[in-house]
């Protein structure tokens, strides 16, 4: 499965980068995340439970950050196991300065196997896209509110995906 997208986040690139490397922000942003533990600056373990088709899948796995080019890009690789199957994948995450903040783009390659793979690629693709949208909405909301708290800036924030406003407070 391949998935890609881009998001506009109305914060400067350095703040977005720092948040992408903050384990607590990631834990709160990942759909269904029950735990997210930092093992080193580039290694984490995580457990997340999500409904995928008829399965309530709880995955536990390892995550590594590679090819780090701060504050511009990295590759995040992970693999996890569940009683209903396994998943593995990697995502190239890239940050670029944009007119109103930062453009975050990603390209994901993922594989699933076991019982969960039997539900079909279309349902898996739809679920993955939905989870990516939920992640980036939560991520944007969290880092925007952190920015407001720290810098006492105007609380108007927005995140756009391909020019479609997803959140506008």
Task: Place the predicted regions along the sequence by residue.
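Hydrophobic ligand-binding cavity/cleft-lining segments
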Residues: 1-47, 157-169
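Intrinsic-disorder/low-complexity, polar/charged segments enriched in Ser/Thr/Lys/Arg/Asp/Glu/Gln
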Residues: 2-6, 43, 58-60, 73, ...
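Hydrophobic/aromatic beta-strand elements that line small-molecule binding cavities or substrate pockets
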Residues: 5, 34, 61-67, 89-97
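A generic beta-sheet turn/junction motif
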Residues: 9, 50-54, 69, 82-84, ...
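Hydrophobic pocket/interface hotspot
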Residues: 16-20, 26, 65, 106, ...
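Glycine-rich portal/gate segments that line the openings of hydrophobic small-molecule binding cavities
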Residues: 37-79
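Beta-strand/loop substructures that line and gate deep hydrophobic ligand-binding cavities in soluble
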Residues: 80-126
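A conserved amphipathic terminal alpha-helix motif
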Residues: 115-154
